[in-house]
């Protein structure tokens, strides 16, 4: 994935502004500041999202965008069956759970947008 990301950045002409790593995110440390943190299609597969949200909060990125799949859409049950049958747990959320997770993880400034299948969260430091 890192090779693909590097190739895409090179093709887009932004390779000098990008750095990609594969690592244990919860244990990782980098002295460089971040402009943004993205977690799109990530919390679908994380049993304990609070640990990651707290770590993302500690990055001090000025803008963060997260997605959380909605519980009880037409897509929920077929997706749950298909993924679990293949040994891949998947997790779904309701709006109050997303807001609770965010606040308990130290996020105070956020907008939760209701999309058709997901909640899209724009979180900010201030």
Please describe what each predicted stretch is.
Residues 87-106:
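Short alpha-helix
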